[in-house]
From Swiss-Prot:
Key words of the record: ATP-binding, Cell inner membrane, Cell membrane, Membrane, Nucleotide-binding, Phosphate transport, Translocase, Transport
Protein name as catalogued: Phosphate import ATP-binding protein PstB
Record PANTHER family: ABC TRANSPORTER I FAMILY MEMBER 17 (PTHR43423), PHOSPHATE IMPORT ATP-BINDING PROTEIN PSTB (PTHR43423:SF3)
Source organism (scientific name): Xanthomonas oryzae pv. oryzae (strain KACC10331 / KXO85)
Topology term for the membrane: Peripheral membrane protein
Length: 267
C-alpha cells in the first residue's frame, strides 16, 4: 500500500515541548449521543498537532471543546477536563472572555465580517482592550503581517473585506484570530475551500505561526497533515486510536486501524 512521505523533522521539532493543552478522560454528548469517548491527549506547546480520521469521527468536535464553542448550542455536554496551562477550561469558574482571548479559532469557510479590512482585525481587540489610535494601528498591522496579508492590503485597509479573494479572506481570518495574541490557534479544515495555490500559502503560514502559537489543525487531507504537523492524532468513531509524532504515525503506526486508514484501506 502507498505510504505518505513525511518531511524530516528538524532539531527544534524533535525537542521535547511542554504540554500546553491536555484532555483528561474527556467525554462529549450531543443530547444522548456519545460523540467522544474518554479522550486523553496532550498538545505540546508551539507545535502543530493534526487531527485526522474519517468524517464523523469527532475531530471537529474535539477542536470545538478546546475553546468551548459548543456551549453556544443547547443539549451539548462535555465531561472530564480540558487543561490549558493546567487550568480546567471546562470549569464554570473559568471566564469565557479569558478563554476567547487565549484560544483563537479559524473555520473551514472564510467568514470575514461585512466591514472594512482594518475593522475586521480591530473588532476583537476593541472588545478586550482599550488602545490608543496609534497602538491599534500598530496592532492591526502586526496581525496582518502575521497573517501574511499586509503587503497585499496595506493600501486598501478601508475597503470591504468581502472584496478579497477566498485565500485572502482566510488569511484575514487568521490575522483576526492572532490579533488577540492567543496562546492557542485552532484551525478547522482551513484550506478545504481553497485552491491549491492558496492552500500552499496557508500551509507556509502555519509553519511560520508555530514559532509563536500552539496550533491544532483538523484536516481530511493526510498529505497536508504530513506536511504541516509535528504530531498527529488519529480518531475513529469518537475514540482516540493513536497519537504520536507525525513521522511515526505515517511510517510506523502502532495500531492496525491507523495503518489501515493512512494506507487507504478504509475511510
Amino acid at each position: 500500500m502507498h505510504r505518505i512521505a513525511v518531511p524530516a523533522a528538524t532539531g527544534a521539532q524533535t525537542a521535547q515541548a511542554p504540554v500546553k493543552v491536555a484532555a483528561r478522560n474527556l467525554d462529549f454528548y450531543y443530547d444522548k449521543y456519545h460523540a467522544l469517548k474518554s479522550i486523553n491527549i496532550e498538545i505540546p506547546e508551539k507545535r502543530v498537532t493534526a487531527l485526522i480520521g474519517p468524517s464523523g469521527c469527532g475531530k471537529s468536535t474535539l477542536l470545538r471543546i478546546f475553546n468551548r464553542i459548543y456551549a453556544l448550542y443547547p443539549k451539548m455536554e462535555a465531561r472530564g477536563e480540558v487543561l490549558l496551562d493546567n487550568e480546567n477550561i471546562l470549569s464554570p469558574k473559568y471566564p469565557m472572555n479569558r478563554l476567547r482571548s487565549k484560544v483563537g479559532m479559524v473555520f473551514q469557510k472564510p467568514v470575514p465580517f461585512p466591514m472594512t479590512i482594518f475593522e475586521n482585525v480591530a473588532y476583537g481587540i476593541r472588545h478586550h482592550e482599550k488602545l490608543s489610535k496609534a497602538d491599534m494601528q500598530n496592532r492591526v498591522e502586526h496581525a496582518l503581517r502575521q497573517g501574511a496579508l499586509w503587503d497585499e492590503v496595506k493600501d486598501k485597509l478601508g475597503q470591504s473585506a468581502l472584496g478579497l479573494s477566498g485565500g485572502q479572506q482566510q488569511r484575514l481570518c487568521i490575522a483576526r484570530a492572532v490579533a488577540l495574541r492567543p496562546d492557542v490557534l485552532l484551525l478547522d479544515e482551513p484550506t478545504s475551500a481553497l485552491d491549491p495555490i492558496s492552500t500552499s500559502r496557508i500551509e507556509q503560514l502555519v509553519e511560520e505561526l508555530k514559532r509563536d502559537y500552539t496550533i491544532v489543525i483538523v484536516t481530511h487531507n493526510m498529505q497536508q497533515a504530513a506536511r504541516v504537523s509535528d504530531y498527529t492524532a488519529f480518531m475513529y468513531l469518537g475514540d482516540l486510536i493513536e497519537h504520536d509524532r507525525t513521522e511515526t504515525i505515517f511510517s510506523q503506526p502502532s495500531k492496525q486501524q491507523t495503518e489501515d486508514y493512512i494506507t487507504g484501506r478504509f475511510g
